[in-house]
């Protein structure tokens, strides 16, 4: 069997679900950044940017909310609710250290973001989104 013919087919789903955010990440705790929400990948991950160019979008992992993974029970509902709350709206974010002590984890900045002065994590909880991710 010619495995080299099959490998691109196996990789295609991963590529199709890759997020488009490619901007430079804030790398110090306390760094403030903001932008319009351009992309929501899951229930606690999103991208903000001030232009329509994905190479400027900052990928964020919310520090104050742990959504279920997309393939777990409640994961898609969490993502959909986050989209409804923030998509296209301006967020003000502050980079913070995650549980590992790092600000950047898995090519995402750990941050607390606010929408109209309210923490996005609090908005998700108020909307009834359950926590349960990693």
Please state what every model-predicted region is.
Residues 4-8:
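Sec-dependent signal peptide hydrophobic core
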Residues 2-3, 14-134:
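Small beta-barrel nucleic-acid-binding modules, primarily SNase/OB-fold domains
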